[in-house]
Amino acid sequence: MAFEFRLPDIGEGIHEGEIVKWFIKAGDTIEEDDVLAEVQNDKSVVEIPSPVSGTVEEVLVDEGTVAVVGDVIVKIDAPDAEEMQFKGHGDDEDSKKEEKEQESPVQEEASSTQSQEKTEVDESKTVKAMPSVRKYARENGVNIKAVNGSGKNGRITKEDIDAYLNGGSSEEGSNTSAASESTSSDVVNASATQALPEGDFPETTEKIPAMRKAIAKAMVNSKHTAPHVTLMDEIDVQELWDHRKKFKEIAAEQGTKLTFLPYVVKALVSALKKYPALNTSFNEEAGEVVHKHYWNIGIAADTDKGLLVPVVKHADRKSIFEISDEINELAVKARDGKLTSEEMKGATCTISNIGSAGGQWFTPVINHPEVAILGIGRIAQKPIVKDGEIVAAPVLALSLSFDHRQIDGATGQNAMNHIKRLLNNPELLLMEG
C-alpha cells in the first residue's frame, strides 16, 4: 500500500501554501530526507523533505496550486515505512497525550537542561525537521531550536536529538552540512557560468525562482488594483545631518548603528497619525475602508533572493535608537534568509530606500493592501537658496506613491509636506513625532 505524504505543519504558523516547485516526479527513486518540493507562503519559501525512502508513485498537487496542511500531496511506494501522521491531520489525540506526557518524570529529568536553553536559544531560528523528529524532541523534553542539525541542508534528525540529550550539540555535523551546502553552491555557480551557446544571438533560459514569482505576483496585483499617483520632492537636511552626527558616537557607545532611516520612520509615523487616510486599506469588493489604529512600518530590503519587507511593529512606541537597532537586526536576518513570516506581516505603510543604491527619485509600487509607500533617495550636495544666498547643502530626495482611490492629491502632498518639515528640523520629531 502506498504511503500518502501529507503537507505537514512546518511549525511556522503556515496552514496552507502554494506548491511552487516539485523536485521529484512519478517513477523517481528517493531517499529519506530528500527535498520533495518548495512551498511558498507570503514571502517565505520552505523546502519539504521526504520522511521515507521509496519510489514516487504519483504527484497529486500541481505546481502553482495551494494545498492545505493535511492534504495528500504525493504518494510514495515505501513498503518499510511506518504509519505516520502529521501535525494538523488526525493527531489531536496524540497532541493531548503529549501534553500530559510533558508533565511526566521523564520531563522533570530534562528540566535542568531546558532551563539553560531558555536563556540561550534563538526563538526566531528557522528549524528544518520532519514532524516525526519534532515529536521525538517533544517526547524527550528538548527544545528543538537548541539543536544543531547534521542532515542535508542543516536538517535535524533523531540522532541529533539523541546527541543533544547526551550532552552534545551536533556542531560537527552542522559544520559538515555547511561545507556540503557551500560545495553544492559552488557547483550551481559553476553551471551558471557554463559556456554560452554558439551563434550570433545566444540565449539561455532558466525557470523563474519561487521568490521572484511571489514578487511579480505582488507587483502586478498592486498596479492592477490601485491607481498609483507619485509625488516627488526634496528637502534640505543639513540640521538632520548635524543631529545624526551629534548622536552617532553616543549611539555607537551602546552598540547602535545610527542611520538616517529611523528618523524617516518616525517622520512617516507622525504623518500617518496626522493624515490617517494613509494608514488604511481600501476594500473595494466589500465596500469598506479599514482604518488601522496602529503604526507598523515595512522596510523594503534588497537581498540575493529578491525583495523582502520586514516590519517594525508599533514604531510609534519606539525611540530612534530602538528603531535603528530593530532595522539593523531585521536587515541582517533578511540577508541571511532567516526572516520568519511573522516578521514580514502586519505593515500599515512601507518605506523603500533606493538611496542606499545611489538612486534619487523613483515611482515605488504600493505594498498592497496598504495605500501608500514612501521612497527615499540619496542625500546629495546641491546648491540651494538660503537667506538670499546660494549655498551648498545636503538635500534628500523623496517620492510618495499613494492609492488615488483612497487618497486625494492634496492629502498626499500635505502628508509629504509634514514629513519634509520634520526632516528639515529633527528636533520637531521630539515635539510632534
Swiss-Prot record:
Q: What is its EC number?
A: 2.3.1.12
N6-lipoyllysine: modified positions: K43
Note the InterPro entries from the entry.
Answer: 2-oxoA_DH_lipoyl-BS (IPR003016), 2-oxoacid_DH_actylTfrase (IPR001078), 2-oxoacid_DH_E2_comp (IPR050743), Biotin_lipoyl (IPR000089), CAT-like_dom_sf (IPR023213), E3-bd_dom_sf (IPR036625), PSBD (IPR004167), Single_hybrid_motif (IPR011053)
Q: Recite the UniProt cofactor note for this protein.
A: Binds 1 lipoyl cofactor covalently.
- Domain Lipoyl-binding as annotated: residue spans: 2-77
Active-site positions on this chain: H404
Task: Reply yes or no: does the keyword Kinase apply.
Answer: no
Region of interest called Disordered, as start-end residue ranges on this chain: 80-134, 164-204
Q: Which ranges are annotated Basic and acidic residues under compositional bias?
A: 84-103, 117-126
Q: What class of enzyme is it?
A: transferase
Q: Which Pfam families match?
A: 2-oxoacid_dh (PF00198), Biotin_lipoyl (PF00364), E3_binding (PF02817)
The UniProt family comment states: Belongs to the 2-oxoacid dehydrogenase family.
Boundaries of each Peripheral subunit-binding (PSBD) domain copy? Answer: 128-165
Q: Which reaction does it catalyse?
A: N(6)-[(R)-dihydrolipoyl]-L-lysyl-[protein] + acetyl-CoA = N(6)-[(R)-S(8)-acetyldihydrolipoyl]-L-lysyl-[protein] + CoA
Return the GO cellular component terms, semicolon-separated.
Answer: cytoplasm
GO MF annotations in UniProt = dihydrolipoyllysine-residue acetyltransferase activity; lipoic acid binding
Q: How does it assemble?
A: Forms a 24-polypeptide structural core with octahedral symmetry.
- Please list the residue ranges that the record marks as compositionally biased, kind Low complexity: 166-185
Function, in words: The pyruvate dehydrogenase complex catalyzes the overall conversion of pyruvate to acetyl-CoA and CO(2). It contains multiple copies of three enzymatic components: pyruvate dehydrogenase (E1), dihydrolipoamide acetyltransferase (E2) and lipoamide dehydrogenase (E3).
**What does this protein need as cofactor?**
(R)-lipoate
Report the protein name in the record: Dihydrolipoyllysine-residue acetyltransferase component of pyruvate dehydrogenase complex
Q: Which keywords describe this protein according to UniProt? A: Acyltransferase, Lipoyl, Transferase
| Tagged with keyword Transferase | yes
